[in-house]
């Protein structure tokens, strides 16, 4: 018989930097999860990632207070900011351009994000990422709108 799910928690935590402090502690504490056990397993699972990379995680909590978690790929906006070398997107993306990314950088990001996007086609994934870039005020070189 399958375990009974009592809740799912979605958090964005920097890789290798999970700690019992907010937002992790209170979110897990509400469901009675062993916080230190999660922190240790999350930090171990993100050991290969660059420290500080924001990683979305979906934690499934069961009735016996056990849990499982799934690591997602970093948000497209985070990857685009890294590629363009900027701190934040434009406040007015239509008028203000804050950085540039090439078609090759868009392809790399699309390949990373592929498993979380709702497409199997790399070209469609590139268009999704390019749209995110445009909405952040990042200019995309070599890719038609």
UniProtKB/Swiss-Prot annotation:
NCBIfam families: L11_bact (TIGR01632)
PROSITE patterns: RIBOSOMAL_L11
Family assignment from sequence similarity: Belongs to the universal ribosomal protein uL11 family.
GO terms, molecular function: large ribosomal subunit rRNA binding; structural constituent of ribosome
Entry's Gene Ontology BP terms: translation
This protein's encoding gene: rplK
GO cellular component: cytosolic large ribosomal subunit
Protein name: Large ribosomal subunit protein uL11
Post-translational modification: One or more lysine residues are methylated.
InterPro entries in the record: Ribosomal_uL11, Ribosomal_uL11_bac-typ, Ribosomal_uL11_C, Ribosomal_uL11_C_sf, Ribosomal_uL11_CS, Ribosomal_uL11_N, Ribosomal_uL11_N_sf
Role of this protein: Forms part of the ribosomal stalk which helps the ribosome interact with GTP-bound translation factors.
Subunit structure: Part of the ribosomal stalk of the 50S ribosomal subunit. Interacts with L10 and the large rRNA to form the base of the stalk. L10 forms an elongated spine to which L12 dimers bind in a sequential fashion forming a multimeric L10(L12)X complex.
Keywords assigned: Methylation, Ribonucleoprotein, Ribosomal protein, RNA-binding, rRNA-binding
Disulfide bond residue pairs: none
Pfam families: Ribosomal_L11 (PF00298), Ribosomal_L11_N (PF03946)
SUPFAM superfamilies according to UniProt: Ribosomal L11/L12e N-terminal domain, Ribosomal protein L11, C-terminal domain
């Amino acid at each position: 018989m399958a375990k009974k799910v009592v809740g799912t928690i979605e958090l964005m935590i920097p890789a290798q930097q999970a700690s019992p402090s907010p937002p992790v502690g209170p979110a897990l504490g509400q469901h009675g999860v062993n916080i230190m056990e999660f922190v240790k397993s999350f930090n171990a699972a993100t050991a290969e990632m660059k420290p500080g990379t924001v990683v979305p995680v979906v934690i499934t909590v069961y009735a016996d207070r056990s849990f499982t978690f799934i690591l997602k790929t970093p948000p497209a906006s985070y990857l685009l900011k890294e590629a363009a070398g900027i701190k934040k997107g434009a406040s007015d993306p239509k008028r203000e351009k804050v950085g540039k990314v090439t078609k090759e950088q868009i392809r790399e990001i699309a390949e990373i994000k592929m498993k979380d996007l709702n497409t199997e086609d790399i070209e469609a994934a590139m268009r999704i990422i390019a749209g995110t870039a445009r909405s952040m005020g990042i200019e995309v070189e070599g890719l038609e709108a």
